[in-house]
Each structure stands twice: as C-alpha cells, then as structure tokens.
Amino acid sequence: MTLQVCKDDPWLKPFEEELLRRQALVGQWKDHFAKEGGLAEFAASYKRYGLHVNKDNSVTYREWAPGASEAVLTGDFNGWDRQQYHMTRDEYGLWSVTVPPTSDGQVAIPHNSKVKLALKTSNGQWVDRLPAWSTYVVQDLSKSPIYEAVFWNPPESEKYQWKNKSPPTPANAQIYEAHVGISSSEPRVGTYKEFTKNILPRIHKLGYNVIQLMAIMEHAYYASFGYQVTSFYAISSRYGTPEDLKELIDTAHGMGITVLLDVVHSHACKNVDDGLNNFDGTDHQYFHGGAKGDHPQWDSKLFDYGKYEVLRFLLSNLRFYIEEYHFDGFRFDGVTSMLYKHHGLGTGFSGGYHEYFGDEHVDQQAVVYLMLAHELMRELQPLLRPGEDAGNFLSIAEDVSGMPALCRPVSEGGVGFDYRLAMAIPDMWIKLVKETRDEDWDMGNIVFTLTNRRHREKTIAYAESHDQALVGDKTLAFWLMDKEMYTSMSVLSDPNPIIDRGIALHKMIRLITHSLGGEGYLNFEGNEFGHPEWLDFPREGNGSSFHYCRRQWPVVDDKLLRYQHLNEFDAAMQHRGDHYGWLSADQAYVSLKNEDDKVVVYERAGLVFVFNFHPNKSFTDYRIGVDQPGTYTLVLDSDSPEFGGFGRIDHEKTRCHTEPLEWNGRANCMHIYIPSRVALVFAREDDPRRK
C-alpha cells in the first residue's frame, strides 16, 4: 500500500520504507502503552506522579529516580525532618510514599507549603531536588535565586471555576504571540491578571482569534524568554498563580479566542538544583548521557526520546496543559533541533530529500515522539472535547529545515503538525530593509519567498516575531524608521519622508505577508502598531534594567501619535482577513510581478490584491488581469487617512469595470489607479460577503 504523502509527492517514494518504519515504531510504542490502558491513559500519568491528595486526605508522592539509592519526602509540613517519610522503590526506579492525614482527618501537607525531595545518589551523596512533576514553584530572591517547590492544593472555594467552552477551531488562524511578563507598560514583570484585564480586550478588538502564550512553563532565568525550562509542569509563578492563568485562558475563550502554549520539549535547562539535570545523580536519566546530551549552541540538555519514562513525562506534560489549563494546542519550539542529530547547526538545507531521511541525519526517536504527541491529541479530542462544535487541538512546528510531510497526518505518513512557521519570510524582510534600496527590491523574489511552501502542508506566515525583536536586532518599524521614531511620530510634526516611507512599507509588508504568505498569520505583541526599539530582558549586562522589557501601550493610545494608524490598519487587516477568509482559501494566483514598476497583483478568495512598491511612481489607468468579470470596488486601502496614508484614492468614485480581454493569463482585465507605496484590495460589488 502506498502512503498518501507519497501519492501526493512522488519525490517521497524512495523514502517510503523509512516513513513506514516510523509508523511501525509509533505502533510499537502504543503496544507498550496498552499495558497501562493505552496512549491517552499513559499520558494521564500526571494524575499519579508527583504529589496527589487521596480520598481519605492522605497524600501520595511518586517520583521516577532510578539512579538513586534512597529517597525522602520532606517539607514545611514536617519541620524538614529527613527521617520521617522515607520512600520505597519498585523494580523500575519509581519511588513512592504516602503521608497520612492529620489526626482530625485533614491533609497533612498544607496548601502553598514548601516541599523537597532528598535523594541519595549512587556515590552516597545526599542531594535536594524539586519534585519533577511540581505544578508550582516559587523564587525568593532575598534568600536565593534557586526555586522552591510548593504543594498547590487550594480549597474548593479558591479553585478557579471554568465558565466558558473552548471556541471552535478558527478556519483563518490569526495568531497574537504574547509574553505575559513584558505586557505591562511599566518597567516590571506583568501579571496574568493584568494581561486578562488589559491585554485580552486589545487582542480581541484587533481581530486576532488565536493567542500563543510564551514563557509559561517555569524557567529560572527570566532573560531566556522562557526557552530554558526548569519545571515542566509548573506555570511561571512570576506572573501569578495557576488559578490566575486559568482565569486568563477562560476569559480568552469567552471572547472566542483559541489559546496555544509555546511548549518547549526540544531541550531543558541544565540547572541541577531546580531543574531536571542530574536529577537522580546521573546525567542520563531524562537526557542522553555524555556529550550527546548537551546542545552545543543552547548550553542546555537534550531529552532521550527513546526512553519509556521520558515519553511518559513529555506526553503527560501535553495532556496536563490541555486538561488542567484548557490550552487548545501547542506551538512546538525548536523542532529542527529535535528532528536532526546535527540539530540544524552548521547545516544548510538545499531542498534535496536525502537531507530529510536516513539514520545518519535524522533522530528517528524524536520524530516518533512528535508523531506520538499528535496521535495523543487526536485521541484526546473526543475524550476531552466531544461535540461537533468543539475546537480541535492545534499544533505548530518551529522548523527551518522544510522537512516534507511534517504537516501531514500520521495516518498519511506525516508527523502530524497542523502548521509550520514560514521562517524564511521574516529573514527576507529584514534583509531587504537593511541591505537593499527600495528601487532595487526584487518583486519576483518577494513573491517566491511568500509562496514557496509544500503542497497540502499549511504554513503560518509572519513578517516578524519575538525573534526579530530581541536585543541585537530591531523591530521592523525600527529598521524602517529608526531614531526618527523618537521625534517625528506626532501628528502635529512636519511631514518626515522617513516616517512616511516607514509607515507605508510597514503596512504593505504585513498585508502581503498576511494574504500571500500562508494559511495562517502571526504577529508578536506590540508590533501591530510598530513598536519601537527592541526587547531586552533584565540581565547582568544591562544592569538588570526593565526599560526595554515592556510594551509601550501609551504610544498607541495617544491620539497625537501616528502609532494609532498602524494599529487601525492591523485591525482592519485582521477583520477583513477573517471576513473574506483568504487564509483558508486556496493559494493565490499571482498574475503580475513587474520589476520595473514594482507592482505585484494576485487573486485569492475572490479578492484582487494590488501592491505598488515603487518609491515614487504612481500609475493611472494601470491595466491588471482578473479572473471574474464585474465591477470592482475597494475593501481595503493602505493609503486611507485613518491608516496614516495620504488619501489619494477617492473611494466613492472608484468603481473599476472589467473588459473581456485576456491579460496576464486572466480572462478579463480592468484599469486602476495605483499610488506609490500603496496596497489595495478589491472585491466585486456583487460579492455576497460585502452585505
């Protein structure tokens, strides 16, 4: 039997045996999990591992630590007595102990009290560890930078009560990438509650239907942007409590917004005292032993995805966030590093299929883990979210390699992701604005980069994400306008050609990326209004300053500043995109890429998109080809005054009638006026979606 992916892409046929072998490995793991009730039940291990209250109010603690010779649970609850609760070990290295209730039948370990695991390693040394399955850990910098585990077991009256169902899966994924900690305009760490109150309404008003939350999994080093995870089951306590995060997600759901977790399963922080590294005294418990377990660039540890208990830990982690916090899916970080033994370092991908296959290049165990993760989400769908209107669990891969079939179902021979990030697109835009004169922009290369994606594999397009905002780089707006943003963004200022150019190109770049670059779109928090400068977390090198570690919301709220115009355009783009459904439509038909005129024309979702990137030439009676005959009028004009434009087009008088003359490969044509540095979107007057 030929796999569906090989039918769709004949270039995969020589590698079908390897694709089938991956499927067989997934099947073998499922057979192993069957003895624990199957994949979904295996991934419910978070309900058994860690600390859990039993019906009789006793507390049972389980921890896998095969390299330890003794284990003791201790904490505030017993005065840190290291003799009272010695744990027993089974043949697989699973330690357990039960703490009986108090004499009056209450839970002996108080809510929000601190606990520790003391382990005796094989060399006879006693070490303290945070339980690996801790759901809340805290830091008291007045005492130590090392995190401490907390037993989170609030009384029923303090537990968050869910009010809203998860929304249906959006057909047009418009993603707002956000970081709770930087969401305050003040120079400090923001909170879950502040995000719920102040930021969610902004996101909803803009028209985004998905939020991708970064830096939620606990990380000891704030400046790691959340990518050096220390406690995988603990949500970051910097921003508040588990109940606060639940309120945030529930409120978003009430607004019809899907919420994704930026999950980091590609590596782990190398911290020992408050991480997983050397947890049981060995370097090979959760990770590969020796140099194989070290990421040469990230200075972090690499999971051994071929181990039964590692799969338990990671697969359960996914179900935990879905079931406990009602996350609607995941953006998997660092997928390229997982897929390949070389981690994508020092390797350029030419597109040759041999680069994506073979045990020499590919970490098959990691690929199989990702396939199992998607099989888990598929199994959990009817179990946790029954009903036709229930949203599906979404997944996005951060992969720069372009591995074929990454975003195809496991049953068809793929890895299972719904989307991949179009990581070449932001690189193209930054390179253009940094290195190339406007008059030398290559329309053909822009279009090629935006449309270069695999057949039947969906892509999330973006002009910039958090990666481009970090210190050492700058936001797109700052590359375009730089220091002029400090002095010339007032609506009362004299006209400034640098600002005018920057605002015009910022809108054009985002619209062409949104409408041509993929089947979904992503924006990083604040960039919708052209956030100035860069992002720099407090660290030793900047005097622990929060000055660049915040979002400057006052500039977009100030009606005397031009940031409002970029914000209004972004909102119009999101609302038009969702209304007309161009992201879920077939890929665009590009009818014109004129290098001399710097004009690009394409059609998608029954709309006609026209871009004039020329720095100073406007065109009257410019003939363009269109597929459908009729009368066309504007539904979006980047030059409109409310978007900071010059209002060079009279919308009331702009009615473009087609002629039955073939032009640029289209059956009809029409004549339009295209001012310089303007993007226009036309729809037929009789389009029922205009009603």
Curated annotation (Swiss-Prot):
One of its GO terms (cellular component) is cytoplasm. It comes from Yarrowia lipolytica (strain CLIB 122 / E 150) (Yeast). InterPro entries: A-amylase/branching_C, Branching_enzy, Glyco_hydro_13_cat_dom, Glyco_hydro_13_N, Glyco_hydro_b, Glycoside_hydrolase_SF, Ig-like_fold, Ig_E-set. Pathway: Glycan biosynthesis; glycogen biosynthesis. SMART domains: Aamy. This is 1,4-alpha-glucan-branching enzyme. Belongs to the glycosyl hydrolase 13 family. GlgB subfamily. GO terms for biological process: glycogen biosynthetic process.
